[in-house]
Amino acid sequence: MKITMQEVAERCGVSKALVSRILNEDPTLRVTPATRKKVVEMAEQLNYQRNINAQALSMSRRQANIKQLRIGYLSFSSQKHIGHPYFSRIIEGIIDEAARSNTIVLVGMGMDDAQKQAENLLKEYADDPLDGMILLGRLDEKKLKRVVDRIARYVVCMNKGYDKKSDYVGTDASLSILPALEHLYKLGYKDYGLLYGGDDVRYETCVNWLRNHQLSVSPEWQIDGEFTLSVAQERVAKALEKYKPPRAIVASNDEMAIGCIRALQQAGYSVPEDVAVTGHDDILLAAYVEVPLTTVHVYKKELGRLATRMLLDRIQSGRKATIELEVSSKLVRRDSCGYKLRDKA
């Protein structure tokens, strides 16, 4: 029976990718002499026969002096966030930019079971670290930073505060919600509700801004929608059973805003005639819902591209200095804020 590379990897307790790079004599590989010796001896012991075509391709690449970099992206929030319209556009930018640069994107996952995922990542990449990693979203599990440090040589994070030696690119979450608030304020709204998600810096910004402008927001209309359409719709509907809605509701993302609009409409309220609603992110659906959503546009795909460029630059240059880059956002005015009604008034 023909021995596979996977069997060699399992016998050695390392990844298949590492076995491939050792047996194909990848000159860019950094691995301990003991691990290299262990893999080579196990392959010989099992009489493993390398794929001649693959070996020839590897050799031709070396001869052409082409180094194919290996990077990944990782979310420490949840696997469901990877498929979220916001993250999916960022990932699209990462993959597009990587494809332009002879770079393989090997890892892409969320951390539903953080401990299990950490163990899997260490098993796969600790002996053969990736050239770099892009971290999406907030770092919920601080202990997993040690894992990232072991599986990737360089890191670009998209939330501030990861560490002082990694590059950062992103949008200032604490400030990006302000254009929506200021727009509603200019339209004359005095009574507000807030839809947020957990530990949400946009929510904190909204509370402080409303307080500073002496505008009201009642406790019953400060609702945790968990950043999802369904939860926001359900909780807004429950609030509407007991309380009259405020004149304007500011949501920390578009999905919660859309869920809010649906709950209002099902309860007999009109948007924006009775209640104005704004979102954040400008996901594709925002422009195509029944009441097109006023929102803050974040340049998501460009963020992914920039993160990849920064990462590749650092890998290739080996620079020590870190870079912090913030990308601006902009208000997109659509029907849900009621500006057409106010302009006529």
Segments (PLM) and residue ranges:
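N-terminal helix-turn-helix DNA-binding module of bacterial transcription factors
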Residues: 1-62
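Short, surface-exposed alpha-helical segments at coil->helix boundaries
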Residues: 36, 84, 88-92, 200-207
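Alpha-helical recognition/docking segments in bacterial nutrient-uptake
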Residues: 62-182, 186, 239-241, 345
